[in-house]
């Protein structure tokens, strides 16, 4: 349960910081339709399933409107970190509860982030032999079906973070990390956003020592100025991770501490090679 809470927190922080970039990257038609100049993140809502005795909390709920129209539109984003047989039904229940409470249009979005490739449904139907009763649709994003190489030229920060959750082979892990660092260098974000993206990426793609050595070799092949910026980014993340790990000592701290240790290995090797920092 704690692990689920940690994953939910990471995605919530990423999407609340880069909501417009997320919608633009994966749902361009929705991006063109909604007014992102006027968005408000609503408090997470808790729904109780009395029949099953379960409680579920809405992951992300955004209040906005359509361009050129009056009235409120809600965008509901649900992150699903593990396969669930009745997930489509749960999306419908969330939708119906939100509509019942707010009485406005709701755009439901499901993000599937687990590594297994599955054909996830994007609808929930209730039918009789003699008539259809319900055909509920929702938008879906199955990250593991997206090729990471299709996004490495993007300047979208969400694309950089989510490289770690996209479809790649084990032998590509080093290259994925290298391209992630290149994207950060190119985007030149402020330190807070840089730390957020690095923390997210390092949580889901942690290189082993052999892979770190290979990454060192690859960084040694790039332009020296670019390599220096990569080292600076890694150094900043290492320092913040060490402080946070000492302060928290929780699950998140342990994950970041592990990533931080690997960053230290890479830094020691690169400092010897380039002789700075």
Name every feature range the model reports, one short phrase each.
Residues 1-277:
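Elongated, amphipathic alpha-helical interaction scaffolds
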